[in-house]
Curated annotation (Swiss-Prot):
Gene, per the UniProt record: hscB
Source taxon at top rank: Bacteria
GO biological process terms, semicolon-separated: [2Fe-2S] cluster assembly; protein complex oligomerization; protein folding
UniProt xrefs under SUPFAM superfamilies: Chaperone J-domain, HSC20 (HSCB), C-terminal oligomerisation domain
Recorded GO CC terms: iron-sulfur cluster transfer complex
Keywords assigned: Chaperone
This protein's name: Co-chaperone protein HscB
Length: 173
């Protein structure tokens, strides 16, 4: 059973987060291992496995990029385990330049302002690519969506580096 079916959701990228959370809580109540403490070992094991599946499914569907990767996996694109190399040289060059720019921010006269500007530009890039990804997934353009998700992974990692630098700058302040 796929995660969308498990949570009673249509198999599409846009999910009703309230319905997801509500169903998650209900499934957690039904399959909580404590409810099976007095059951035979086999029942306990099955309940524990189901609880793990419920948690994994919830975390996957809750996180936008993981949800997109999961949808693609349902259509034969296993991005989580692939050794695919990026063929978009322009995108790769842009990533190199962005990473170099980020590395230089801490040495600037006003690094907080420079980082805020950088983060705003990065958020714009992520928003644009995310909108494209949603459209591609909705239109079942799996190959194109997979390529966009690969690019979003780069941007997501860069955003994590921005957050780390922000924390370092705050610690130094």
């Amino acid at each position: 059973m796929d995660y969308f079916t498990l949570f009673g959701l249509p198999a599409r990228y846009t999910v009703d987060r309230e319905q997801l959370a509500s169903c998650y809580q209900e499934l957690q109540r039904q399959f909580h291992p404590d409810r099976f403490a007095s059951q035979p070992e086999r029942e306990k094991t099955l309940a524990l496995q189901q609880a793990v599946t419920i948690n994994d499914g919830y975390q996957t569907l809750k996180h936008p990029l993981k949800r997109a990767e999961y949808m693609l996996s349902l259509h034969g694109f296993d991005l989580a385990n692939e050794q695919h190399t990026m063929n978009d040289n322009a995108f790769l060059m842009e990533q190199l330049m962005l990473r170099e720019e980020l590395e230089c921010i801490a040495d600037k006269a006003n690094p907080e302002v420079a980082l805020a500007d950088f983060a705003a530009r990065l958020n714009g890039m992520i928003k644009t690519r995310s909108q494209l990804m949603v459209q591609q997934l909705d239109e079942q353009q799996w190959e194109q969506a997979a390529d966009t998700v690969r690019k979003l992974r780069f941007l997501d990692k860069l955003q994590q580096q921005v957050e780390q630098l922000e924390e370092r700058l705050l610690d130094d302040f």
